[in-house]
Swiss-Prot record:
Located at the top of the head of the 30S subunit, it contacts several helices of the 16S rRNA. In the 70S ribosome it contacts the 23S rRNA (bridge B1a) and protein L5 of the 50S subunit (bridge B1b), connecting the 2 subunits; these bridges are implicated in subunit movement. Contacts the tRNAs in the A and P-sites. The gene is rpsM. This is Small ribosomal subunit protein uS13. Belongs to the universal ribosomal protein uS13 family. GO terms for molecular function: rRNA binding; structural constituent of ribosome; tRNA binding. Coiled coil: none annotated. It comes from Rhodococcus erythropolis (strain PR4 / NBRC 100887). Residues 95-124 are annotated as: Disordered. GO terms for biological process: translation.
Amino acid sequence: MARLSGVDLPREKRMEIALTYIYGIGRTRSKEILDATGVSPDLRSKDLSDEDLAKLREYIEESLKVEGDLRREVQADIRRKIEIGCYQGLRHRRGLPVRGQRTKTNARTRKGPKRTIAGKKKAK
């Protein structure tokens, strides 16, 4: 099984898809990586040679932030916004949507399960 950046790549998938299993690499970046290293996107990860794997590993390590480093950077950015007290930081602190979405209805993913308010009755 091919292993890149601490992630086991699925054996049966094409490299173009298999690379997207690494946090921080999507389809577009996957294509860029394969073009830069000269590895065929149609090659299955089980068919990768050691030399192809080394090329991919070297390219990803030297030019991209992925997995743990990227997760830490994102968390640090969120912490910084909370500390400086900007609007986005306040929204993060309150557990509400950060990017201007409506909250009167919807936003349940961010707000969590619905909490019923005691003593509120419908008018007849």
